[in-house]
Amino acid sequence: MIRSGTLLTLPAIAAFVVGGVVLCGVAVVAMRTTAVSTAAPIALEELGKRVLVIAPHPDDEVIATGGTIHRLVAAGVGVKVVLVTAGDSYLRAAARIAEGSPSATSYLQLGDIRHRESLAAAVRLGLRATDVVSLGYSDGTTQAMWDASWDESTPARGRTEATRVPYAWAARPDAPICGQRLAADLESVISDFAPDTVIAPDPYETNADHAMTAAFATYAMDAVGYAGRRLSSVVHFRHYPYPWAHLPGTALNPPPQLLSPDTTWLALPLDAADKEAKATAIAEYGSQTAIADLGLYMRAFIRTNELFASRAPARLLVRNDDSRPSRDESATIAATPAPVVPIPVGSTRPRINAIRMARGPRTLWIGLRCDASVTSTGTFTVGLRLFGGEAPARLDISVRGTEATTTAEASNSIAPEGVRAEVDGDTLWVAVPVDALAGRTRCMVGASVERTGGSPMRAAWREVDL
């Protein structure tokens, strides 16, 4: 949408035209087949006897997996759903309640409404109220919980103004809104329910709560040593699904930008009863479907199949020396999907295109390959979450130019000596002494860059076998 006051220069007009053409092309590619998905078929039996669905907000469990849940329950499979947040900070929905500018009270009312909607939707899918675990954390706070609000002493605050879970219906009322608590909640559910399959959001989703719920789910699974099947689902990724239309006879295909050698896309077929159950469950979320474009968006996920991605942990490249590796001497851990519309010349840069890693006898190298030369104008952060041996630990590194500093963000932070940074054209390399990884078998790695005049650009958190 072009806002009032937008300056329509020739480059801007060209960008709009190019964007429209590219988006149309993406839609055509995504819809090339009609009733059968391009993803590999997966049989219901392959999911096992117990399936755990972890969703960021009430309604995501239906949008991503509603038909699958209905099929599983009908087949006698045990299903449990965890709703991480209360979905209480959606401005447009809260404004409808307030009939104007929403207050903290309006957001709390929205949280209560969406909780009731989630229970009604669960019934439509064949679940019982006891199959739904509503954690009640504040919508929009998961990024803060993962970063600076990890400890109970530094809770996050959302639009409800609460720093503790404010809902009596939550699994743990009055729990501090912090990453440590959320991770423990997920670890407890995984350990107690012992699922054969866990379905969580995809790490490449473009909504922060979705991407960070993916990170928290991975963290919890790695913390408890979960060895079952891990699948992810996509709800928010740019203009996905293609197109935004109610097309129940059309297949759901993977976003073309997320096709990669390290990802296997799987399609679970839905029958008429599954699609009908999903449609009625979506309709229970009246606080969302009443918003015209959102209702259409939700119904666009009622297709002939539901879609899941399977990714194995990445493996870093092992080298015989500790010198800074070249691009060919490192392994790609996370590749940022290319933008649908090319970035205009002169826009805020750099962007992180990929995270690469290599390990020598004494040094772990983490490379952030960017779309422009790395200069001292941006501040990069590199994060590691370490598993195996002792309790999980975290290492947070801030880099400006070639000055690298470890930061103590949480009580489980470590600060090894000898961390340093080097720049090689479009790649920032961070060196971490291998001694800091002693006893660790797996890590999660993520990165971001704060660009001048722009919001931080974040690369997806991915797990790596060490």
Feature locations, PLM:
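Short, well-ordered beta-strand segments enriched in hydrophobic/aromatic residues
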Residues: P361-S373, T427-P433
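Active-site rim elements
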Residues: T105-L108, P201-N207, T263-D271, P416
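C-terminal accessory domains and tails appended to enzymatic cores
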Residues: I2-G5, G19, A27-T38, Q143-S153, ...
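Short Gly/Thr/Asp-enriched flexible loops that form oxyanion-binding sites at enzyme active sites
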Residues: A208-M221
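Acidic/polar low-complexity flexible segments
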Residues: R3-G5, A314-R324, T381-T407, D424-G425, ...
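Proline-aspartate-enriched helix->loop->beta-strand connector
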Residues: L186-E205, H210
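Active-site environment of divalent metal-dependent phosphoester hydrolases
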Residues: D60-I63, S89-L91, P203-H210, Y240, ...
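Active-site rim/loop-helix segments in enzyme catalytic domains that contact anionic ligands
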Residues: I2-A12, F16-F193, T218-R229, H236, ...
